[in-house]
């Protein structure tokens, strides 16, 4: 797996810091992990696919050596972010190997076909929609809400306790442009990401006197592995939805992962 990122456009020293990145083998979060690692942090990637994480870690490590002439500490851990006991067990291992958490990036998330409508808007004629709001699968809705919202809340509960004692720490939640402006089709995903934004605001207040910072970023549109089929046809040409997105984007293109570093 080849990962290509630009050189870090800033100089920050994170030596002695431990960063945990959930969803760390994904397109966007692996770019963020790279930025943390070449800045000196020890990085723990959390994901569900061990083989994919190994490929990402190998690529990031090699690129850091080639482009930055730096030796990095990046390790992978398989964990279910919606299972608190799994998170607790994983954190015990991370803490023993890399130290307690200083930086947490909550990037685990995703969508499910059963939680997406086929049409962007309800047809004028009743009964002509292939898969409308009323057809959404209850189980898939719960899965999307759990992965995105609970998969953000639970890691914060588990990984940030040590920050309180240190009176220092940074939590960065990955929301979405759909947190602010609900997008057509992806009703459940938009609601889950909106919940993350509200959670972030609540935690920023709750942690306000503790030295722990909690912020969120709301990325726009990026061509990533999980949305590839939504944005591109089998021949590589953009889908009508992709063309519509680009037409409504001032820069006239999708974002690049390294722009989030």
Which residues are covered by each model-predicted region?
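Alpha-helical segment proximal to the catalytic Tyr-Lys
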Residues: 161, 205-206
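A glycine/serine/threonine-rich, flexible loop-to-helix segment
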Residues: 10, 117-124, 209, 221-249
């Amino acid at each position: 797996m080849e990962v290509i990122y630009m050189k870090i456009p800033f100089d920050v020293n994170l030596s002695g810091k431990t960063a945990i990145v959930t969803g760390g083998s994904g397109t966007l979060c692996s770019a963020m992990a790279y930025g943390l690692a070449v800045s000196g942090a020890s990085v723990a990637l959390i994901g569900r696919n061990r083989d994919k994480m190994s490929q990402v870690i190998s690529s990031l490590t090699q690129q850091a050596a080639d482009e930055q002439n730096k030796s990095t500490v990046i390790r992978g851990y398989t964990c279910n972010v919606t299972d608190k006991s799994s998170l607790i067990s994983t954190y015990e291992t991370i803490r023993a190997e890399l130290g307690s958490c200083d930086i947490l990036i909550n990037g685990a998330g995703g969508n499910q076909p059963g939680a997406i409508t086929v049409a962007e808007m309800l047809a004028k004629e009743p009964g002509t929609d292939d898969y409308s709001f009323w057809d959404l699968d209850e189980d898939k809705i719960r899965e999307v809400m759990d992965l995105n919202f609970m998969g953000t809340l639970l890691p914060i509960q588990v990984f940030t306790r040590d920050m309180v004692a240190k009176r220092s720490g940074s939590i960065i939640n990955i929301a979405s442009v759909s947190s602010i402006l609900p997008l057509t089709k992806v009703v459940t995903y938009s609601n889950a990401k909106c919940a993350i934004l509200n959670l972030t605001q609540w935690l920023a207040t709750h942690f306000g006197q503790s030295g722990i910072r909690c912020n969120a970023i709301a990325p726009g549109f990026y061509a990533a592995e999980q949305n590839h089929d939504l944005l591109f046809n089998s021949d590589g040409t953009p889908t009508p939805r992709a063309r519509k997105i680009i037409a409504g984007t001032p820069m006239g293109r999708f974002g690049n992962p390294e722009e989030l570093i």
